[in-house]
Amino acid sequence: MNHSYTFGAFPTIELLKNQPEHVLKVLLHPDMNSQAQMEIISGLCTQHGIPLERNGKAVEKLRDKENIFAVGVFEKYSNVLEPEKNHIVLVNPSDMGNMGTIIRTSIGFGIENLAIIEPGVDVFNPKVVRASMGSLFQLNFCYFKSFEEYKEQAGSRSLYPFMLKGAVPLQELQREKGETYSLIFGNEATGLPDSFADEGQSVVIRHTDHIDSLNLALATGIGIYEFTR
């Protein structure tokens, strides 16, 4: 399928603001009661020449929750990473909720480039879009067949794989000020392969022995916060 959906007014508004050229149409349910949101959506559709339909049956057929009253229909698109900027790299991510949360966190702290090493979830899945609260549409992202392919295209940068066997605790890490970097995180279930210990400077987020690991979205958020503060 070459198109996808935004479910809800806020993600739909973010789509219209940031990627209007890819929007096919917007559907509104007659039960939508936020006049302010309707006016924003209507204004953006008019501004960009996007069809706006008030079609309750179409919304009800597409939505996965009864409290969804706005649906954006958009064509999937591709873009490229900025080699001079900092990147988040996710190796084989499999959870759509985590992906959306990571995107939202990354955009919130100013990292706007995401590399996904295949296989990985589709960033355009409506569950990812919703978990990102529409911040996906501010993101540069690219899928790569392998980490080696990513490195070939990423430009000169420092690499920081986050691993349980990381050599340096995050809170003790010494970095060059102003460096361009990539923060690398593994799959939710398996983490990064041991071979990533040889890629740049491996890092570990220390925690108590009462748990075996951190949730991927949480670990990524901690790493992003430490590197951007």
Model-assigned labels for residue ranges:
Residues 6, 51-56, 139-149, 203:
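Short acidic-hydrophobic, aromatic-tinged amphipathic segments that line or gate anion-handling sites
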Residues 28, 80-166:
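RNA substrate-binding interface of SAM-dependent RNA methyltransferases
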Residues 55-56, 91, 117-118, 140, ...:
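Short beta->alpha connector loops at strand-helix junctions that form conserved
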Residues 162-212:
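Active-site/ligand-binding-proximal alpha/beta "capping" segment
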Residues 1-71, 156:
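N-terminal positively charged helical leader segments and presequences
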Residues 72, 107-109, 123-137, 194-229:
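Structured adenosyl-cofactor binding patch, chiefly the S-adenosyl-L-methionine
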Residues 8, 94-102, 213-219:
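Amphipathic alpha-helical repeat scaffolds
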Residues 69-79:
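Short, structured interface segments
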